[in-house]
């Protein structure tokens, strides 16, 4: 369901054939650059060329699907370069708090039930885990799908191609998927959208775009309950450092970083205590 405070449209300025297909897929209106200039503020989804080319000539794989909020620059997902790849190389590997929270086994199978922009899922895959990303927003899922496709193109580093092969994307409501499909996995990871207290200049434009599209997760407790009945080893919930744990069953342990806390729900211990 569209929750953005701005109307969302597909921009056909670049790659019009792909834009038309995407508009049909997402059931969103198609708009030209001229029409967009004359309209009220819009949230546009379309292709963007960031100046980096795969060769001597620009071709279709040089374009990234991006979200264009009215007040910020383009927001896209890139597993090949930029922050996600930097985090893979210099983020601390298995010693980083996120990795310590989820690595219940050497290479656990993980469901990231709140995939968002895919940053944490990419970290899991870079550590050798098979990861299923579940994203309920069709628009964010389209951005993820485009990023996965670009990361497997000829010319992309082999190690990155191997990482993204371990990522699978499902566009669905996570609670419904876990309840109806009962997938087998070791770990389920949740990163609920926390209600924004106030807007600041420091708020990342990716986070602003997510907040516009999906708003806060008001069903986090329901999702946690579903996850606890599916995960084989543990459920991990990412929270702001000083935020309370999600209501319901309390976590067995927590791992903290400067601004974040990872609450760990160990399935075996919870069952032994009669809490599951």
Curated annotation (Swiss-Prot):
GO terms for molecular function: rRNA (guanine-N2-)-methyltransferase activity. GO terms for cellular component: cytoplasm. Its EC number is 2.1.1.242. Pfam families: SAM_MT. Keywords: Cytoplasm, Methyltransferase, rRNA processing, S-adenosyl-L-methionine, Transferase. InterPro entries: 16SrRNA_methylTrfase_J, SAM-dependent_MTases_sf. Its main location: cytoplasm. CDD domains: AdoMet_MTases (cd02440). It is an enzyme of class 2 (transferase). S-adenosyl-L-methionine binds at residues 135-136, 191. It catalyses: guanosine(1516) in 16S rRNA + S-adenosyl-L-methionine = N(2)-methylguanosine(1516) in 16S rRNA + S-adenosyl-L-homocysteine + H(+). It is found in: Cytoplasm. Gene3D superfamilies: Vaccinia Virus protein VP39. Specifically methylates the guanosine in position 1516 of 16S rRNA. Belongs to the methyltransferase superfamily. RsmJ family. This is Ribosomal RNA small subunit methyltransferase J. It comes from Hydrogenovibrio crunogenus (strain DSM 25203 / XCL-2).
